[in-house]
Amino acid sequence: MITRAELLDMLASNAPQGFEAQALGLVPIVVETSGRGERSYDIYSRLLKERLVFMVGEVNDQTANLVVAQLLFLESENPDKDISLYINSPGGSVSAGMAIYDTMQFIKPDVSTLCMGLAASMGAFLLASGAKGKRFALPNSRVMIHQPLGGARGQASDIEIQAREILYLKERLNNLLAQHTGQDVERIARDTDRDNFMSSEDAKAYGLIDQVLLKRP
């Protein structure tokens, strides 16, 4: 049977550098040495020990399940210490995003949010939902807000039901975004009518974040 090391060597000799990790879905391993010997962690598990949670990629049920589980675990570890949620996401499912949002508000620790790269749609909503005064973005990140998207097929009555649900979600999200940004609901409704992209400084002025971070404090 081929070993993991042999497989990586084969890939390295036939593919560009770094490709093997992407192709196999591998995650870097961190080795820590103590008086009791060595212990290895995947990089995300090691960062979880520092209370760092990553939400990267599409917001879907799988993403929500992982983020919620980590938030609940960190609360059980220490209910009084802040959690940092790093966001680089184009958005996705409203229901999955609301599962993360409700958990952020439910748990005892403050959840600090930080945008790296892009926080769009539900990603931007969750960015703004962090603890007041603890919402950040890196200088070249982008933020985008818009109204929820949806579509329906079938009988006219079924389409009407789906349309009512989308309108309800739009109103609910606008009210929550107004609460977190300090903007009035009418402005939120206007500004989310179409894709609305912002720089990190624009997002700060709008109230989506509290500070643009150039360097770690």
UniProtKB/Swiss-Prot annotation:
MF (Gene Ontology): ATP-dependent peptidase activity; ATPase binding; serine-type endopeptidase activity
EC number: 3.4.21.92
Localization annotation: Cytoplasm
Source organism: Burkholderia cenocepacia (strain HI2424)
Chain's role: Cleaves peptides in various proteins in a process that requires ATP hydrolysis. Has a chymotrypsin-like activity. Plays a major role in the degradation of misfolded proteins.
Gene3D superfamilies tied to this protein: 2-enoyl-CoA Hydratase, Chain A, domain 1
Protein name: ATP-dependent Clp protease proteolytic subunit
Similarity remark: Belongs to the peptidase S14 family.
Entry keyword Cytoplasm: yes
Top-tier EC class: hydrolase
PANTHER family: ATP-DEPENDENT CLP PROTEASE PROTEOLYTIC SUBUNIT
Key words of the record: Cytoplasm, Hydrolase, Protease, Serine protease
Assembly information from the UniProt record: Fourteen ClpP subunits assemble into 2 heptameric rings which stack back to back to give a disk-like structure with a central cavity, resembling the structure of eukaryotic proteasomes.
Catalytic activity: Hydrolysis of proteins to small peptides in the presence of ATP and magnesium. alpha-casein is the usual test substrate. In the absence of ATP, only oligopeptides shorter than five residues are hydrolyzed (such as succinyl-Leu-Tyr-|-NHMec, and Leu-Tyr-Leu-|-Tyr-Trp, in which cleavage of the -Tyr-|-Leu- and -Tyr-|-Trp bonds also occurs)
Superkingdom classification of source: Bacteria
GO biological process: protein quality control for misfolded or incompletely synthesized proteins
GO cellular component: cytoplasm; endopeptidase Clp complex
Catalytic residues of the enzyme: 121, 146
